[in-house]
């Protein structure tokens, strides 16, 4: 019993870590209506500033803390509110979530550009160093609470008490909640919604800064990925509190930390449960809470009763353009692909050819996002994990059974489809934020539990996958593999287009408009979404098997980490989540754009070296440009692209395509009109009797028969 109690007490500091992050998320959601996935990125920004001024410039502790937490943290929140989120108050949950996803990608890269990209080892603590033997509790046990743990506990309790008092007993807390529910109605009651919104974001960002500075010493080096993974682990406490209750969130964080510590003390250190289950416990608890917490699945976001109805995104251009243009576009696309293939075959060296092949394969994986996100309206954040399942299935089948690689790729896709179907059955009951969190929890569970297992990934040494022979053609030659990848992409795109234009695609389009209306005409929303999720998983698994075959091994860390999967989602939704063209171009862009930027950023330094007589100020300015900026600049642009989703939910490529198609159709119709043939699809003008009719009472719409008489 004493051992159990000691383990439970040891879990309190860890629970407070979870609780501090979870309370910060709840505060942001409660005061702005945004489930801020970028909370960890904001925490990283403040922690990086604290590191630089405290350790590099040796500022006093107090001034460094004030700058990082009290100045930089709220300043980031104010900037985000003024530039972005003030325009998203009445937007849907998908737009807010995608915007925060873009910020999650962009903010750490901006910090690296501003403060430098060097490794930051041993982040300095926010507290003064104390002797750890002064913090024994109780004195006659082996429990040790050091200064950092005491500071974390004290900060978490203080924050929770202060926020509870703020929301229960202050007018500011009441105004914050009122502005989230309806900015317009709050303004009618004399509330300055602009000022309240700014205050809310500054307060939540201050808490993010405090969490970042306080928790950074838990890691050997300052890394945004560590803070984000810790944030996702804390999401279980957030869901335990229903995304609104701060006391329940605090209790959930404590319970999670205690449970993890009890498991650590009870399980054998060398057992599979200890090495796999304990690190994955927060993600497993999050997944189970999302599925089974009472009332959570029926929770819907609060909508502003005075807000206008949010229009659905326009129909895909491929479904509404004239038939002659569809035929012409596909013929023109085939010519462009043939010319591009010939140019790659004869002009590119091995490096650039490899990037093109990788981009095409990634385009296939991104086509899975077209099915689940574009057509299904479900923000899935686990497609990288499903692609990894296809890659591991391919590698294991080849290694264990000697099966042909092509057959193993197909069966690997079937395995991924089976996993996707099993995941979809419970997950599709969720929607919006909850579905995105459930798929993210699955991705992290897969990474923590299954990837380390030798029968899944091969263990520490990745499984190799040889390139196959197809008759006399050896795919070990990159040029032949390029042709093979293009043919595979064409086949998958045909499947996606057929699905989009078929019955399932029409059902999914109806479900995006209204579940109730779709159900009234006999459409099963659950069955249609399970089908979409399963097909998307199969496509992702097929792409993962192709990627493993091209790379030569099924390597999770280099090809399929969950954070890279989030970048894929951000990149595709910014380009167009319903367009096959956007998927292929996004895959190519992901690999080619950073490489092109690297070449561009290398040129100034090379020029300075080859021109030693250049003016010193020119040499200094050009020499400051570093080639390693390329990755940061590329990811910043990827994140900014996701932020534009709120303005163009159809995607930038789809929006530009719609503009071009409209211009071409108008030009053709004008030409036909000048030739005396009239427009190709004449639309009769509205009847004046209907247009001039008096409106229906209370609707503003004319009646068809009033005005036609008399």
Residue ranges of model-derived segments:
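Transmembrane alpha-helices and adjacent helix-loop boundaries
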Residues: 17, 21, 40-45, 90-123, ...
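Transmembrane helix boundary and interhelical loop/hinge segments in multi-pass membrane proteins
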Residues: 166-174, 178-182, 499-505, 511
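Hydrophobic positions within alpha-helical transmembrane segments of bacterial inner-membrane proteins
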Residues: 19, 23, 27, 66, ...
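Short amphipathic alpha-helical coupling elements at transmembrane boundaries
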Residues: 85-90, 175-188, 509-510, 520, ...
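Short, hydrophobic transmembrane alpha-helix segments
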Residues: 1-6, 26-35, 51-64, 342-354, ...
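Transmembrane alpha-helix boundary signature
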Residues: 80-86, 110-121, 169, 215-216
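Residue-level signal for short hydrophobic patches within transmembrane helices
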Residues: 1-12, 16, 199
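Short, strongly hydrophobic alpha-helical membrane anchors
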Residues: 1-6, 134-140
